Amino acid sequence: MNQSQAPVGVFDSGVGGLSVLREIRQLLPNESLLYVADSGHVPYGEKSAEYIRERCVLITEHLLAQGAKALVLACNTATAAAAAELRERYPQLPIVGMEPAVKPAAAATRSGVVGVLATTGTLKSAKFAALLDRFASDVRVITQPCPGLVECIEAGALQAPATRELLQGYVEPLLAEGCDTLILGCTHYPFLKPLLHSLVPDSVSLIDTGAAVARQLQRLLGQHELLATQPAQATRYWSSGDIQRMQAVLPLLLGEQAQVHVF
């Protein structure tokens, strides 16, 4: 098989990375995609870095065995915990990670107050601290860990009253502090944008990094002469959690039905 027609492997702690997969599809419609949801171990945000690294190596090995030509860590927590080790272990493999959009948010804010919704793991990471030091020295950044939100999205409860109540509790303190720019620092959270728009004023910008990750993948594949030129094959999905549940949320999150395999 021509290496440029090989698939790109994408993975996340659960279904959140599908928000990134959606952006990759839009920008790179010829790329065939493989997706692993590690839903049997979700959420990563509450796990140790060592545990997350072990999971990431297992998943990467699986994706390489399926012929992946590149890897997208569609998870902020996994990137913070494991990207450096994966790049060291697989030096020939183009790897794209993700980080909360601190730089664009610091540039966008008018009030000088930026809110960050993320998992505990991302907010505690050295990588996040370094991002704040580098890009947010002139703005006030208020971080808000969001336990429970990932689980709501995994269950497909995007508009449920309980999800709304939880999200409102996380967002209101940020708005009270004058925050006008909200970073969605977890790939699950873009699926809550419709709900968020109903909870925050129109003047508040919501910033996530899915599109930026797709552009970085495009750059890396181009550098390695790996951009696909033929139409994509159907996306293949795996989950380490409840297969039926993932099959049920795919139409909600991506508008498609697909078979999910056991990982």
Swiss-Prot record:
Catalytic activity of the protein: L-glutamate = D-glutamate
Pathway per the UniProt entry: Cell wall biogenesis; peptidoglycan biosynthesis
Residue positions binding substrate: 12-13, 44-45, 76-77, 187-188
UniProt-listed GO biological process terms: cell wall organization; peptidoglycan biosynthetic process; regulation of cell shape
PROSITE patterns associated with the record: ASP_GLU_RACEMASE_1 (PS00923), ASP_GLU_RACEMASE_2 (PS00924)
GO molecular function: glutamate racemase activity
Residues at the active site: 75, 186
Enzyme class: isomerase
E.C. number(s) listed in UniProt: 5.1.1.3
Leader sequence segment: none
Keywords: Cell shape, Cell wall biogenesis/degradation, Isomerase, Peptidoglycan synthesis
Alphabetical list of Pfam families matching this protein: Asp_Glu_race (PF01177)
Name listed for the protein in its UniProt record: Glutamate racemase
Gene transcribed to yield this protein: murI
